[in-house]
Structure formats: C-alpha cells, structure tokens
C-alpha cells in the first residue's frame, strides 16, 4: 500500500487533474494506492473569505462564482477525456452548491454563522475534488472506494483546527473491507468529531490527513505531490543558488517546517515519524524528479546542513525586573498564561544576568499578549518589581537546520561572519535543544540580504563574487568578455562571478541574482533605469552580499569621491580610475583607513602600468622590508609609442596622429603630451612607496609650450603641432649622433623628490629599447641593486587594463 496526496496546485485545472489521474494509474499498476485530495488551487481560500467577512447578499454571488469554476473545470475535462461523465458530475456540483446556498440563506436569517457551519462551507472544494477524480478514474475502468473522513477520522478540538485521534481512527478504518484492486480516495482537510459533525484540520490540513491515513493503512510510503521538486535548501523566491535535498530526517523536517519552510507542516511529520513511514515530496509538473525523501535519523557522523529558513512579521518582548532574579515562579507564570491563551512562543532567550528574559512571537498577537501580561503582573509593575515591557518590532528569525549542528565546527562563526560582511546586526541567538537548529533574530529589513549571505556561505559550493560594474567603455566591455571567456576555468576553481549591476553614465541594468553575460548588451539597451549617484546609493543600500565589489572603469572624479561611502556600505572597491589615488593626501588616507576599519579591500592595480603587476609587486617588496633607492619609468603607453616613432624618424605631429588613430591617446592628444597623466601615475607610485606628497609637488617639464593649452579641438591641436616637428626632429638627431634616444620618464629619488621630463638615455639604460606603447618600470632597491627590478610590457589598451581589473577581482577572495 502506498499513499499519494495531491495539493491544490496539482489540481488547478483540467490538464492537471488528468495528469494526477495518470500518476495514480501508473502507481496502481504496481501496488494498491490510497489518494488524498485537496481542493483545486485557491478554492478553499476563496470559500474561507465567505465566512471571514460579513455575510450578506453578495455572498450568494460569490457562491455562484465558485460553482462556475468547477463547471468550467469539468467542461475542460470532458473536452480532453470524452468518456468523462460530465452530466453526473455537474449534477453533484449543483447539489453541493445548492446546499451551500440554503446554508447561506439560513445564516442571513439569523445574522450570524454558527461555528459548526463554517467547516461545512470551506470544505466543499475537497469533497468535489474527490467526486471529480472518482468519475475520471471510473471512466477509465478503475474500481474506486471512497473513504468518508467524517466517519472514519475521529477528531479532537475545535471546528476549524482539529487534531486526529490516530488510535481510534485506525480501529475504524481497519473495520472497512476494501478490495485489494480498488483505488482508495479520500478528501483531505476533513474529519469528524465524536458527535459525527464535520470539522476541518486547520492550516495544511490535507497534508495532515494524508499522514494520518498513511498511518491508519500502514502504508509503506507517503508521497506528497506538490508544485516543487522537493525540499530546497532555502526559499527559491528570495534566495538564488538553492538546490534540492535528496534526504532529510524526520527531526530535520520538523525543524525546517517549524521555522518557516513551506513544504510540510510540523503536524504532518508527527504521525509519519511516530509510525516510521517514509515520506517523499514530489512534483506533479516534473514527475521524473527524484524528490526529497524524509525518513529515519541520518548517520550520527553526518553533520551536513539541510537548509536556512525564515519567519517574518516577528516581535520580541524584553521583560526585565528584580522579580525575575532567582525566581523561576515569575518566568513560569509568564509562559503559563501565554500557553493557556494559546499564544505561540517561537524562541526564548534568557539573559545571563537572570533579571531579564526575551521571547519572540508573531506580530499579530502583540496587543493581546500585552493585555494578558499586564493583567497578570499588575501588582509587580505597580511595585516596580517588573519594568515596562519593551517590544522590538519588525523582526525576522533566520534558522539554519542540520543534523548535529551544534557539533559542527564554526557554523555559528560562519553565520555571524556572513551577516557581518553586510553590516547586519544579530539581536538574539538561540540553539535548538534537539541540536538540529541555530536561530538568530535580525531586523526585517535585512531579511533578503541576511538569508542570501548565510545560504551562500553555508550551502553554495562555490565562492561567489557579486560585481557592480560602473563604466562599460573599452575597458568595461573587455572585462565582461574576459570573464565570460573564463567561465569554465572559474567553474573548475569553484568560483562564481555574478554581475548584479552594469551601468554607464546614463542608465543601469540591475538584477537581483545575476546578469547573463551572453546577452547583457541587448538587455542593457532595453533597460529604462536611469543612473545617477542618488539612484545608485539607494540601490546599493540593501544589496551588499558577501564578497560584493564595485568596479569603477570610468575616469569620473565625482564617482571616485563616493568610495568611502561604498566601503561603509560593505563593498570592496576595484578601480582603474586614478582620480581617488591622486586626490588630496587627506582623501587618499581616509579611503585606506576606512577600508582597514571595515575589513574591505581597495584595489587599483591598473592605476599604473595597466595589467602589469606593479602595485602588487611594490606592496610585496616593501611588506618584506625592502626600501627604495630610486625609480625611473616610462609610464605612458601613448608617449612610449610617440617617442619610439620619433626615434624612427617620424615627425612629432605624424607620430601623434598615428597614436591617436591606434587608440593610444586621449580624445585630445594634448592631455597625453601635457605630461599630467604620467605625473598622476608617478604620484600613485610615490605614495605607495610611502612618500606623503601631493600632485603639485611633482616637477613636470612640459613637452609642449604653454600656448598649446588653448587648442582644445583635437584637429586644431594636431595641425598646430606641426610647428614643433622640426624642433623635435633636430633634438632626436642630436641624441642619435651620440648613440642616445629620447624618452619621457618619471623619476623618484630616495628623498621623495619626483619629476617628469624628457630624458636622453644611452643603450645601457633598461629603458633604452622601450617603445611601441610599452611601459617599463625600473626599481633600484636594497634587494635589487646594482641590477634593478624591471617590469616591462604593454601599459595601455583595453584588454591589458581589463586583465588587471580581472586579476584584482580574483584577489578579493584570495
């Protein structure tokens, strides 16, 4: 015997009803099947609104609407399965809804709805589901036995939330003679009290019915069919990268359900656990999925984690006072009164000082709990033995579930670390006595961030880097291409880079999970979200996961002034933008102080030498005790190209024009020939070495006369540049005559004196052969002398710069 239960989403329309019938038929070929059915999706909730709201003449219209849903359902079934007995089924539907109308008319006369009538109204959907399924199966030549839950399942409790007496129900069902070849059908959600009245079983009552019937029939397995593949590691609606759990124990399932997992209710697990009946969660829409099995305890050595859940709309009562100290009586009174009034207490946390206790409950009960506690402790409050109740609202409880979780190393520390990375405060923590759960209380506004962080840290097998990219010009686009190309390599290293935002100066593309890099340009063009700093800061406020990084591939000064704010929000910063590192020494220092305080990384390898490992090499050298003696370098790819062409006999104006055409220069080449860009790079190096200087402290010997500043138009500038062709040709020739070449060089002396100028160098100089856009940096240090440390390679270009940014990105997790 196997029991199958199908929920409302599995019976939402005609096609799904018939799909369920197919599953039943297939299973019935192997063994006898008992089936518990819910009402079609939304029907029970729809009928519940009738009894929850004021009952008036409008209710009859709602009854007709509900009836029409069923009529349309069986019409569709008839079209798909012609042998279905439509008229007989329609007649049953008419009879049931006529009963409802008579009940409603009676209620209208007496102006109230008796408690015993409410379950009759809201259970019509389940009863009709069974009749429809019976007719589908019989039209396919199957024998069907219908179990009446009112006469066979004895309930204890109120009309709308009863509990089943399993022992008595077993006796009743055992007396029924059911043919072995018959398919058994029973309406879920329904039972009967000792007076024989129909009652219902409360929230998730159909699942509970299924577990009870499985116990009564001694079923070898209870299959719960729903619209998900099984139990996932978290709610996929709010958490990315969830995955299906193959197996969980009864206790783990109980903890998951208690702390918010929506797949099963704790009451459902109790009977299958008591009678050791395996349970499997299956997907009606994906019958091939293996589902999640729920069974006996895991192997004691299995410490694997099973899920992270949440309960929201939580409040926390803080109760304090001298009467709590050394007095178990006061605490007992608190929880006795709450239990007597059926108030659900989710967590209890007692202060080590013994004069304070906290407990969490649902926000909807706040007023009533306050009322009964104030009434119970009127004297203590009046005498000052108990302080006014402090209530913290808008909270969420996050819980991590797993076998022997208390014995698993570092779980709590990992939870705190993952939340700390996004500056989420933990207000309280509780450890389950079963050793299967750890629960923490946080602010509701931090739910999405907190649960995603914890899940990524504990359950996702890869290290995730969340990227917010600003700037999609040449470097930004090249970076996206490189990361897409390296996806397989990253996957092998268990690294997942997720782009959450891509932006330029006008608009942005943002996704909660990850932007698909295969078609990001197409989606970016479709995006209508504008970009400005106000919008950006608002967006970043609640989106900082673990390892969240802002990458600045712009040259925007205003954006660079936001770095401290970004770091304080929990983001690492990677920038190819030199503006921050060449700003005032005060701002330069503040960024680093903030990054250190917030435990965030500020990386800028591409500020000097593009993809060359300049900054990282310097930091490694000086952190191991080396000291600079002197530095000389060619720091501009455009000037490296231009001066190399001069050496070959090309005129200055022609060399500059060619450099611009090849993309080496800025839009107006004056910016390159002014030497200011080289000075900025030199400033970055000098500060990295340890010199506290400003840009104005660097001596710049200009390549061009002052008058060339006024030519802001690049065409005009290049035309006027011809005036200097003969001067530079003559200077190049003079140097050549004695075996020298001209190079534009940045220098740092041991005393921190920095200069940028044209130098004439001979063939013994390491910079002699550097041209064609290459950069070269020579460091004379205590460790590297008399032969210097030389770093040489292309120091300009989108691909090499992007590779430097990519390298910094991987350093975030290394």
Curated annotation (Swiss-Prot):
The keyword Nucleotide-binding applies. GO terms for biological process: homoserine biosynthetic process; lysine biosynthetic process via diaminopimelate; methionine biosynthetic process; threonine biosynthetic process. SUPFAM superfamilies: ACT-like, Carbamate kinase-like, Glyceraldehyde-3-phosphate dehydrogenase-like, C-terminal domain, NAD(P)-binding Rossmann-fold domains. L-homoserine binds at residues 666, 677. Its cofactor is a metal cation. Residues 1-248 are annotated as: Aspartokinase. NAD(+) binds at residues 474-475, 503, 554, 797. Keywords: Amino-acid biosynthesis, ATP-binding, Kinase, Lysine biosynthesis, Metal-binding, Methionine biosynthesis, Multifunctional enzyme, NAD, NADP, Nucleotide-binding, Oxidoreductase, Sodium, Threonine biosynthesis, Transferase. It comes from the Bacteria. It holds the Pfam family NAD_binding_3. Disulfide bonds: none annotated. The active site is at residue 681. Residues 319-400 form the ACT domain. Na(+) binds at residues 605, 608, 610, 612. Pathway: Amino-acid biosynthesis; L-lysine biosynthesis via DAP pathway; (S)-tetrahydrodipicolinate from L-aspartate: step 1/4; Amino-acid biosynthesis; L-methionine biosynthesis via de novo pathway; L-homoserine from L-aspartate: step 1/3; Amino-acid biosynthesis; L-methionine biosynthesis via de novo pathway; L-homoserine from L-aspartate: step 3/3; Amino-acid biosynthesis; L-threonine biosynthesis; L-threonine from L-aspartate: step 1/5. GO terms for molecular function: aspartate kinase activity; ATP binding; homoserine dehydrogenase activity; metal ion binding; NAD+ binding; NADP binding. NADPH binds at residues 475, 554-555, 576, 578, 797. Homotetramer. This is Bifunctional aspartokinase/homoserine dehydrogenase. It comes from Buchnera aphidicola subsp. Schizaphis graminum (strain Sg). The lineage of its organism: Bacteria, Pseudomonadati, Pseudomonadota, Gammaproteobacteria, Enterobacterales. The gene is thrA.
């Amino acid at each position: 015997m196997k029991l199958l239960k199908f929920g409302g989403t599995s019976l939402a329309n005609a096609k799904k009803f018939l799909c369920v019938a197919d599953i039943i038929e297939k299973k019935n070929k192997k063994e006898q099947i008992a089936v518990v059915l819910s009402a079609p999706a939304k029907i029970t909730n729809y009928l519940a609104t009738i009894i929850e709201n004021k009952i008036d003449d409008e209710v009859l219209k709602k009854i007709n609407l509900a009836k029409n849903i069923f009529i349309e359902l069986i019409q569709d079934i008839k079209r798909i399965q012609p042998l279905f007995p439509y008229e007989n089924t329609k007649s049953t539907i008419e009879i049931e809804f006529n009963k409802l109308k008579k009940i409603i008319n009676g209620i209208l006369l007496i102006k109230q709805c008796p408690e015993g009538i409410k379950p009759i109204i809201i259970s019509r959907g389940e009863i009709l589901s069974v009749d429809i399924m019976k007719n589908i199966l019989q039209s396919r030549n199957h024998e069907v036995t219908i179990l009446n839950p009112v006469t066979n399942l004895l309930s204890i409790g109120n009309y709308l939330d009863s509990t089943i007496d399993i022992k008595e129900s077993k006796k009743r069902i055992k007396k029924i003679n059911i043919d072995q070849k018959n398919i058994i059908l029973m309406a879920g959600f329904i039972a009967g009290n000792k007076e024989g009245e129909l009652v219902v079983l409360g929230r998730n009552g159909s699942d509970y019915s299924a577990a009870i019937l499985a116990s009564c029939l001694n079923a070898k397995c209870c299959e719960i069919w729903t619209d998900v593949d099984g139990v996932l590691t978290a709610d996929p609606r709010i958490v990315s990268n969830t995955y299906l759990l193959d197996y969980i124990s009864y206790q783990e399932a109980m903890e998951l359900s208690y702390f918010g997992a929506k797949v099963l209710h704790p009451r459902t697990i109790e009977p299958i656990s008591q009678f050791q009946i395996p349970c499997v969660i299956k997907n009606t829409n994906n019958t091939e999925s293996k589902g999640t099995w729920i069974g006996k305890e895991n192997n004691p050595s299995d410490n694997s984690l099973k899920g992270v859940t949440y309960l929201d709309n939580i409040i926390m009562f803080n109760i304090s006072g001298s009467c709590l100290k050394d007095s178990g009586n006061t605490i007992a009174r608190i929880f006795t009164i709450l239990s007597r009034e059926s108030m659900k207490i989710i967590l209890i946390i007692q202060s080590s000082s013994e004069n304070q206790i906290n407990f969490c409950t649902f926000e909807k009960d706040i007023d009533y709990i306050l009322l009964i506690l104030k009434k119970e402790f009127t004297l203590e409050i009046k005498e000052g033995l108990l302080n006014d109740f402090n209530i913290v609202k808008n909270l969420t409880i996050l819980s991590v579930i797993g076998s022997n979780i208390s014995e698993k190393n570092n779980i709590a520390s990992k939870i705190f670390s993952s939340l700390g990375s996004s500056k989420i405060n933990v207000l309280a923590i509780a450890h389950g006595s079963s050793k299967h759960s750890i629960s923490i209380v946080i602010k509701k506004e931090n739910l999405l961030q907190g649960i995603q962080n914890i899940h990524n840290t504990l359950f996702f097998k890869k290290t995730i880097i969340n990227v917010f990219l600003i700037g999609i010009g040449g470097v930004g686009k090249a970076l996206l291409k490189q990361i897409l190309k390296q996806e397989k390599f990253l996957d092998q290293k268990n690294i997942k880079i997720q782009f959450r935002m891509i932006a330029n100066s006008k608009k942005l593309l943002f996704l909660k999970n990850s932007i698909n890099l295969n078609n990001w340009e197409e989606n970016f063009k479709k995006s209508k979200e504008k970009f400005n700093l106000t919008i950006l800061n608002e967006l970043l406020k609640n989106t900082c996961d673990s390892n969240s990084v802002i990458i600045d591939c712009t040259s925007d000064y205003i954006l660079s002034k936001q770095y401290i704010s970004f770091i304080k929000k929990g983001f690492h910063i990677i920038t190819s933008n030199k503006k921050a590192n060449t700003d005032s020494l005060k701002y330069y220092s503040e960024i680093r102080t903030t990054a250190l305080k917030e435990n965030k990384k500020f990386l800028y390898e591409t500020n000097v030498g593009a993809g060359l490992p300049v900054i990282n090499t310097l930091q490694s050298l000086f952190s191991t005790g080396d000291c600079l003696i002197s530095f000389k370098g060619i720091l501009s790819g455009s000037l490296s190209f231009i001066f190399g062409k001069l050496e070959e006999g090309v005129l200055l104006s022609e060399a500059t024009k060619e450099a611009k055409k090849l993309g080496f220069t800025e839009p107006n080449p004056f910016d390159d020939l002014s030497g200011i860009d080289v000075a900025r790079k030199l400033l970055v190096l000098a500060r990295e070495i340890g010199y506290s200087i400003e840009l104005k402290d660097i001596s710049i010997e200009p390549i061009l006369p002052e008058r060339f500043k006024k030519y802001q138009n690049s065409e005009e500038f290049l035309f006027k540049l011809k005036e200097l062709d003969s001067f530079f040709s003559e200077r190049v020739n003079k140097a050549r005559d004695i075996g020298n070449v001209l190079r534009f060089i940045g220098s740092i002396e041991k005393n921190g004196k920095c200069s940028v100028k044209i130098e004439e160098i001979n063939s013994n100089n390491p910079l002699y052969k550097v041209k064609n856009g290459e950069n070269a940096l020579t460091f004379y240090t205590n460790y590297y002398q008399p032969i210097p440390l030389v770093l040489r390679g292309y120091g300009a270009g989108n691909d090499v710069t992007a590779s430097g940014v990519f390298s910094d990105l991987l350093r975030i997790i290394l």
